[in-house]
Amino acid sequence: MDDISPSELKTILHSKRANLYYLQHCRVLVNGGRVEYVTDEGRHSHYWNIPIANTTSLLLGTGTSITQAAMRELARAGVLVGFCGGGGTPLFSANEVDVEVSWLTPQSEYRPTEYLQRWVGFWFDEEKRLVAARHFQRARLERIRHSWLEDRVLRDAGFAVDATALAVAVEDSARALEQAPNHEHLLTEEARLSKRLFKLAAQATRYGEFVRAKRGSGGDPANRFLDHGNYLAYGLAATATWVLGIPHGLAVLHGKTRRGGLVFDVADLIKDSLILPQAFLSAMRGDEEQDFRQACLDNLSRAQALDFMIDTLKDVAQRSTVSA
C-alpha cells in the first residue's frame, strides 16, 4: 500500500468534529509539530496533545497563555480560539458592559459568501429580522420539548420533569412569541420561559429553591455549572457562524449593537435544552467541573448540536425574503 502524505488527508467537517476544549492554568504551544497544552505540577511539566483537526473551538480561561506558533496551527486547522474568565465567566466586566468571550477566528479568505449575502438581504429590515428571531425561538422551543421529554439518557439519569407543566410552558411561550410585536417583547418572553424552566428543572432533580444569578456571581453548584456550560454552547455557536461565513455581529435577537450578538442567538438554540438539565443533574450528583464538562460534551455530541445550529442558520439565511 502506498503511503499517504499529510497533505492528502481530508479535513474533518466542523459539524463532525468531536472536541471542544476549555482550559485553565496552562500554556498552549507547539511541541514536536503538535499543538499541546502544558500543566505544571511542582517541578514537573505534563504535556497533553490537542487533536486540532478534530476540534471545533478552544476556550482559554484564567491563567492561560498561547504562543504565536500554536495560534498559527489552530488557525490553519480552522479552530476558533476564545478568551474568557475562569469557570465560564465574562472575560471583562466594566459597568454595564460584559465581554463574554473575545474570539479570534481563523482569518481564512475562503469563507463562503452565499449565506452572508442572504443574511444581509433581510438583516437591515427590522420586521424581517423579527421574523428571523421568531424562527430561532421556534427551533429553541422544539429542541427543549424533544430533549426534556424524549431524551432517554436524561431520563435514566434521574431528570424526571413534569411533562404536563413543561408542555404548558412551551405552548404558552409559543403563543407569546407569535404575538410579540418587537424584539424587546421576544427577549422578555425568552427570559420568562427560562425562569419557568429553571423552576421545572429544580423540581425534576429535587434541587430545592433556585434563583439564577447573573455575571458569574452565583455561589451554588447549579449556577456555577450553568455559567460554565453556557460557554461551551458559545464555543459551538461561534464555530457554526464562522463555518457559514456569517459575522458574529449580525444578530437577529440580542441587539444590533451588542458585540457578538449572533453567537448568543445561536447558543440559545441549545442552552436550555441540553446545558440546563445537565447543570442541575450534575449539581445534585456533586460532580466536579471536569465531570460536568464531559457530560455536557457528551450531550452536545449525542444531540448533534453543532449540526442543528448550522442547519438552523442555513434555514434562516436561505429565506432571503423572510416572511412570517
UniProtKB/Swiss-Prot annotation:
Mn(2+) supports cleavage of ss- and dsDNA, while Mg(2+) only supports digestion of dsDNA in vitro. HAMAP family: Cas1. Keywords: Antiviral defense, DNA-binding, Endonuclease, Hydrolase, Magnesium, Manganese, Metal-binding, Nuclease. InterPro entries: Cas1, CRISPR-assoc_Cas1, CRISPR-assoc_Cas1_C, CRISPR-assoc_Cas1_N, CRISPR-assoc_Cas1_YPEST-subtyp. Homodimer. This bacteria does not encode Cas2; Cas1 must interact with a different protein to insert spacers. This is CRISPR-associated endonuclease Cas1. Belongs to the CRISPR-associated endonuclease Cas1 family. It comes from Pseudomonas aeruginosa (strain UCBPP-PA14).
